[in-house]
Swiss-Prot record:
UniProt GO cellular component terms: peroxisomal membrane
Recorded metabolic or biological pathway in which this protein acts: Protein modification; protein ubiquitination
UniProt topological domain (Peroxisomal matrix) ranges: 1-15, 75-98, 161-187
Source domain of life: Eukaryota
Primary enzyme class: transferase
Gene this chain is encoded by: Pex2
Localization of this protein: Peroxisome membrane
UniProt-recorded name of the protein: Peroxisome biogenesis factor 2
Family of the protein in this entry: Belongs to the pex2/pex10/pex12 family.
Catalytic activity: [E2 ubiquitin-conjugating enzyme]-S-ubiquitinyl-L-cysteine + [acceptor protein]-L-cysteine = [E2 ubiquitin-conjugating enzyme]-L-cysteine + [acceptor protein]-S-ubiquitinyl-L-cysteine; S-ubiquitinyl-[E2 ubiquitin-conjugating enzyme]-L-cysteine + [acceptor protein]-L-lysine = [E2 ubiquitin-conjugating enzyme]-L-cysteine + N(6)-ubiquitinyl-[acceptor protein]-L-lysine
Notes on the domains: The three subunits of the retrotranslocation channel (PEX2, PEX10 and PEX12) coassemble in the membrane into a channel with an open 10 Angstrom pore. The RING-type zinc-fingers that catalyze PEX5 receptor ubiquitination are positioned above the pore on the cytosolic side of the complex.
Role summary: E3 ubiquitin-protein ligase component of a retrotranslocation channel required for peroxisome organization by mediating export of the PEX5 receptor from peroxisomes to the cytosol, thereby promoting PEX5 recycling. The retrotranslocation channel is composed of PEX2, PEX10 and PEX12; each subunit contributing transmembrane segments that coassemble into an open channel that specifically allows the passage of PEX5 through the peroxisomal membrane. PEX2 also regulates peroxisome organization by acting as a E3 ubiquitin-protein ligase.
InterPro entries referenced in this protein's UniProt entry, alphabetically: PEX2/10 (IPR025654), Pex_N (IPR006845), RING-HC_PEX2 (IPR045859), Znf_RING (IPR001841), Znf_RING/FYVE/PHD (IPR013083), Znf_RING_CS (IPR017907)
UniProt keyword Protein transport present: yes
Length: 305
């Protein structure tokens, strides 16, 4: 029976990554709130909030604490991940929310601690008296001890997965799921579908360069021309040098390949370099040599186009 309860608790234990993600979400929310708040004073005198920045931040974080931890027993990041705080000092196995004193001490340790650190830094920054120097050394020593304690707590958290922050360990509160978590069934349908599509995409990437798209397009164009019966008009334009047999536009630097049709130099040269067995899409003549077109075209014909 005890082994079954232990396995159930381990199955419902909050993952370390979920607790760390909740902390990161809280930091992102604080940055977003502060950036949006400072945008409200964008048109005011520069440096207006600089003198009272620690107090303003403390007020905003206190406002967030009032409507998150104090009322809902969870931060915003924890609520997103279906996590909440639990009173670890309670012997009752049923969920017990943190007491009012624990919530108040949590606000004092987190909000008050950050405010005190920022305000003391501003206070000691421009003071050079001996008394202030000793107080600054004591403050730095205390901050160093707290940093060391946070490091040790983080190492213990990585090992045991409980108490993500030093404040939670000191106050005796830890993260639990809001609702009991069922055993998740692993399905591979999505993975199989993704592997199938990735394999198909790699096959297309390998196959498409082997297909002569331009030659295939020319074949289809010639078949469509035969089906629509417009070969006489196209041959007239091609033989008169007014239309490229590949792109269908006025030939730029017109060249021939040994038949009566005319090509742009870029069109015929690129097609020939891509396919040494390139043939004319209109009449099927093989390329013997690419020669400039030697023909006289009246300016009246050019203007008529």
């Amino acid at each position: 029976m005890a082994a079954r309860e232990e396995s159930t608790q381990s199955a419902n234990r909050v993952l370390r990554i979920s607790q760390l993600d909740a902390l990161e979400l809280n930091k992102a929310l604080e940055q977003l709130v502060w950036s949006q708040f400072t945008q409200c004073f964008h048109g005011f005198k520069p440096g207006l909030l600089a003198r009272f920045e620690p107090e303003v931040k403390a007020f905003l974080w206190l406002f967030l604490w009032r409507f998150t931890i104090y009322s809902k027993n969870a931060t915003v990041g924890q609520s997103v991940l279906n996590i909440q705080h639990k009173n670890d000092s309670s012997p009752n196995p049923v969920y017990q929310p943190p007491s009012k004193n624990q919530k108040l001490l949590y606000a004092v340790c987190t909000i008050g601690g950050r405010w005190l650190e920022e305000r003391c830094y501003d206070l000691f920054r421009n003071r050079h008296l001996a008394s202030f120097g000793k107080a600054k050394q004591c403050m730095n020593f205390v901050v160093g001890l707290l940093k060391l304690g946070e490091l040790m707590n983080f190492l213990i958290f990585l090992q045991k997965g409980k108490f993500a922050t030093l404040t939670e360990r000191l106050l005796g509160i830890h993260s639990v799921f809001c609702k009991p978590q069922n055993m998740r069934e692993v399905g591979f349908e999505y993975m199989n579908r993704e592997l199938l599509w990735h394999g198909f995409a790699e096959f297309l990437i390998f196959l498409l360069p082997l297909i002569n798209i331009q030659k295939l397009k020319a074949k289809l164009s010639s078949w469509c021309t035969l089906c629509t019966g417009a070969a006489g008009h196209d041959s007239t334009l091609g033989s008169s040098g007014k239309e490229c047999a590949l792109c269908g536009e006025w030939p730029t630097m017109p060249h021939t390949i040994g038949c009566e049709h005319v090509f742009c130099y870029y069109c015929v040269k690129s097609s020939f370099l891509f396919d040494i067995y390139f043939t004319c899409p209109k009449c099927g003549t093989e390329v013997h040599s690419v020669q400039p077109l030697k023909a006289g075209i009246q300016m009246s014909e050019v203007n008529a186009l």
